[in-house]
């Protein structure tokens, strides 16, 4: 029998699908990535094609193996991590989606959320799912599909349709329709899962008109869910052994497995998570209570603050504003000036997430004067990412009563030294950047590897977390507080705009 030398992480993100292959020392030996189409049918609507998600994800695995000359029988297992909340409904008989995937960023269900609030469900949702009633989560997206796609509700009630977040869709495709599962971390992001009883919430399913027959079975984040045949019929059978939503996978990859440990991922959005162990902390400051992974992949509680626009605001500078040739250029231009010249950029392009939860706020640039140039705008955009992180961290520390000694960071934007230093300054906290910043993939690989015995224990993995750099805070307290006060004023401007806004303005 061939020695199983490798573990695979499939990392299905908002803009691309990736496959990462790791060896026993948790070194990345091969990877492949493919971007896929972003679909914007109307203002504030965001969709993906589920078949394109599957095609790009499956092809990256084949490419990653081929790049390194690795045979499928050398793989010990596969872990999956995914963009969360993004909603797919498909026909289990044909295997075809009934509609495009509705992406977590999509705001089309704001009116459904307002209706549920009017029916008095806001407190019930918070107390039982840990979430706020917001279009961000899966529940209202499922309802929208059933209400708006011809024949969908009838087929759902006849037991023909299945719902899944992206992990569920991938596992279903990889097992050729044999396995319909999700894990606790992804289930906790649907606004349909009771995090007190750890089961689907029948009251919420009934309130949204979603048949329970559509829902996947919920399992731990580290166990064997099924096998996939690599190479088609008669190919090598590889266990699918780990699933976690991208942010919980990153928390695990950073080895934040004990209460009080926290990380921030700077991806499309920014996501700050703090593990609270077996204690469910209910936020009084606009944060979410969600499920994460304990040391063995068992469900644990966490506090989360979600910022919708992180790295995506740098992409906006590049793609829409044409101020950058490449996202990596933002650091160079930001450091060409010694301040943002009084400018604040609030990137509320799809509303504001934690701790504000304002679906109607919109992007705002304030403080413009005649002396402001493009470098100031670029710098202010990067600073806006850091300020949003402070908004969340302040709320998190207030809820938990824990003052963080440091913040562990990961994601594409952490390569930006200006952003990381400014983050440390605005938080007055050490920022720790790991040597391997692919911690989302690491987390999925670790969960799968532990389930199949590729690694023996969490202790074996703790030693693999090597720091690349520690950023120390520089700013004095008076300067820090003055600048943050300006940010809070800018946030108010973004929110007041929505209060004054009329749909006729866009005609």
UniProtKB/Swiss-Prot annotation:
Output the PROSITE patterns linked to this UniProt entry: FGGY_KINASES_1, FGGY_KINASES_2
Give binding positions for glycerol. 84-85, 136, 246-247
The known regulators of its activity are described as:
Inhibited by fructose 1,6-bisphosphate (FBP).
Residues annotated as binding sn-glycerol 3-phosphate:
14, 84-85, 136, 246
Gene Ontology cellular-component annotations = cytosol
Q: Kind of enzyme, top EC level?
A: transferase
Q: Which InterPro entries match?
A: ATPase_NBD, Carb_kinase_FGGY, Carb_kinase_FGGY_CS, FGGY_C, FGGY_N, Glycerol_kin
- The record lists ATP as bound by 14-16, 268, 311, 315, 412
Q: Could you tell me which pathway this protein works in? A: Polyol metabolism; glycerol degradation via glycerol kinase pathway; sn-glycerol 3-phosphate from glycerol: step 1/1
Provide the reaction this enzyme catalyses: glycerol + ATP = sn-glycerol 3-phosphate + ADP + H(+)
A Gene Ontology annotation in the biological process aspect, one of them, is:
glycerol-3-phosphate metabolic process
| A molecular function (GO) term | ATP binding
Q: Which residues bind ADP?
A: 14, 18, 268, 311, 412, 416
State the UniProt keywords alphabetically: ATP-binding, Glycerol metabolism, Kinase, Nucleotide-binding, Transferase
Q: Which domain of life is it from?
A: Bacteria
Keyword Kinase (UniProt) = yes
Enzyme Commission code(s) on record? 2.7.1.30
The record's listing under NCBIfam families reads: glycerol_kin, PRK00047.1
Relate the protein's function as given in its record.
Answer: Key enzyme in the regulation of glycerol uptake and metabolism. Catalyzes the phosphorylation of glycerol to yield sn-glycerol 3-phosphate.
Q: What is this protein called?
A: Glycerol kinase
Q: Which organism is it from?
A: Vibrio atlanticus (strain LGP32)
């Amino acid at each position: 029998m061939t020695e199983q030398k490798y573990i695979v992480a499939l990392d299905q993100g908002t803009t691309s699908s990736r496959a990462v292959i790791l060896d026993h020392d948790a070194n990345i030996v091969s990877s492949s990535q493919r971007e896929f189409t972003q679909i914007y049918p109307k203002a504030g609507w965001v969709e993906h094609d589920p078949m394109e998600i599957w095609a790009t994800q499956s092809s990256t695995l084949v490419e990653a193996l081929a790049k390194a000359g690795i045979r499928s029988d050398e793989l010990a297992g596969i872990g999956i991590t995914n963009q969360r909340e993004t909603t797919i409904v498909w026909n289990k008989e044909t295997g075809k989606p009934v509609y495009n995937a509705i992406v977590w960023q999509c705001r089309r269900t704001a009116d459904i959320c307002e209706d549920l609030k009017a029916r008095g469900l806001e407190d019930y949702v918070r107390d039982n799912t840990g979430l706020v009633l917001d279009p961000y989560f899966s529940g209202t997206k499922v309802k929208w599909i059933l209400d708006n796609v011809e024949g969908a509700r009838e087929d759902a009630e006849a037991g023909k349709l299945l719902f899944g977040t992206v992990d569920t869709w991938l596992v279903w495709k990889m097992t050729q329709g044999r396995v319909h599962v999700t894990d606790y971390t992804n289930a906790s992001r649907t606004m349909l899962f009771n995090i007190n009883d750890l089961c689907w919430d029948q009251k919420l399913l009934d309130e949204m008109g979603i048949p329970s027959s559509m829902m996947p079975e919920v399992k731990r984040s580290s166990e064997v869910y099924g096998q996939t045949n690599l190479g088609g019929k008669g190919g090598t059978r590889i266990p699918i052994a780990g699933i976690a939503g991208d942010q919980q996978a990153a928390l695990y990859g950073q080895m934040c497995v004990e209460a009080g440990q926290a990380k921030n991922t700077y991806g499309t959005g920014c996501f700050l998570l703090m593990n609270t162990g077996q204690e469910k902390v209910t936020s009084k400051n606009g944060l979410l209570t969600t499920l994460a992974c304990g040391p063995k992949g068992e469900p644990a509680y966490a506090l989360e603050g979600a910022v919708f626009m992180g790295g995506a605001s740098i992409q906006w500078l590049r793609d829409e504003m044409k101020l950058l040739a490449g996202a990596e250029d933002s650091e160079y231009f930001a450091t060409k000036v010694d301040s943002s010249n009084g400018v604040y950029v609030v990137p509320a392009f799809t509303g504001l997430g934690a701790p504000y939860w304002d679906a109607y706020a919109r992007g705002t640039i304030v403080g413009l004067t005649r002396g402001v140039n493009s470098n100031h705008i670029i710098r202010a955009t990067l600073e806006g990412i850091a300020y949003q992180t402070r908004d969340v961290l302040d709320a998190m520390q207030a809820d938990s009563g824990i003052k963080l000694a440091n913040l562990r960071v990961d994601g594409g934007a952490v390569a930006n030294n200006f952003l990381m230093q400014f983050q440390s300054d605005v938080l007055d906290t050490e920022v720790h950047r790991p040597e391997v910043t692919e911690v989302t993939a690491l987390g999925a690989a670790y969960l799968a590897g532990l389930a199949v015995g590729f690694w023996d224990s969490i202790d074996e993995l703790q030693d693999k977390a090597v720091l690349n750099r520690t950023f120390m805070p520089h700013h004095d307290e008076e300067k820090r507080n003055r600048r943050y006060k300006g940010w809070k004023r800018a946030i108010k401007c973004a929110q007041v705009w929505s209060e004054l806004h009329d749909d006729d303005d866009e005609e």
